[in-house]
């Protein structure tokens, strides 16, 4: 698994996979941002250890599952990439265009978008059948809800894989279609 973006959301998403024993490569274009993101994850784990929720050995085991990179080429062999970058369509399209070129055929390309059109993101790739939305709620390492956003061309296998993966990382998955705010944000918006 790879996560694009080592900020608050990207770090929280990566922790879900490390908690489930799944190795994660985190990508940031600047080394300082990558170092900061990995340090924040360690701090979160250390806080859990201080509260007695994890042992120090568990902290180290989970941290050992996390690696970082500043180059997209290091993501060539991953099975799933989750983009967790700034919520602007042009930024996301740039990321997905690059992932389309770099990632192996059949890799699932997922966006953590909370409101943007996953169909539009998928359309900038040559493999829209492999593109899906995986919307984690903040803080991603705590909140249980995961919106699995099926785009128009998302294949049944990709949907099935993402629903199974949600269970493995202890999320409650809700399959939704593309619409403004999906389900969670639509429910919250009136309040």
Regions found by a protein language model. Give the residues of each.
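Structural motif
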Residues: 4, 27, 69, 84, ...
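Internal alpha-helical scaffold of NAD(P)-dependent oxidoreductase catalytic cores
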Residues: 148-179, 189-191
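Short, structured coil segments at secondary-structure junctions
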Residues: 20, 126-127, 169
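Rossmann-like NAD(P)-binding element
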Residues: 32-36, 47-109, 115-119, 124, ...
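NAD(P)+-binding Rossmann beta1-loop-alpha1 motif at the extreme N-terminus of oxidoreductases
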Residues: 1-44, 67, 102
């Amino acid at each position: 698994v790879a996560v694009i973006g080592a900020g608050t959301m990207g770090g929280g998403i990566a922790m879900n996979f490390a908690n489930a024993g799944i190795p994660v490569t985190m990508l940031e274009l600047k080394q300082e941002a990558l170092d900061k993101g990995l340090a924040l994850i360690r701090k979160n784990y250390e806080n859990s250890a201080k509260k007695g929720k994890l042992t120090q050995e568990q902290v180290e085991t989970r941290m050992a599952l996390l690696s970082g990179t500043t180059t997209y080429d290091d993501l060539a062999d991953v099975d799933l990439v989750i983009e967790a970058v700034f919520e602007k369509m042009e930024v996301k399209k740039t990321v997905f265009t690059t992932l389309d070129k770099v990632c192996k055929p059949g890799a699932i390309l997922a966006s953590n978008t909370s409101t943007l059109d996953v169909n539009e993101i998928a359309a900038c790739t040559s493999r829209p059948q492999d593109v899906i939305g995986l919307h984690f709620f903040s803080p991603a390492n705590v909140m249980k809800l995961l919106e699995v956003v099926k785009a128009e061309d998302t294949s049944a296998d990709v949907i099935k894989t993402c629903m199974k993966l949600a269970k493995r990382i202890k999320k409650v998955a809700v399959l939704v279609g593309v619409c403004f705010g999906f389900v969670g944000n639509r429910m919250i918006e009136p309040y």
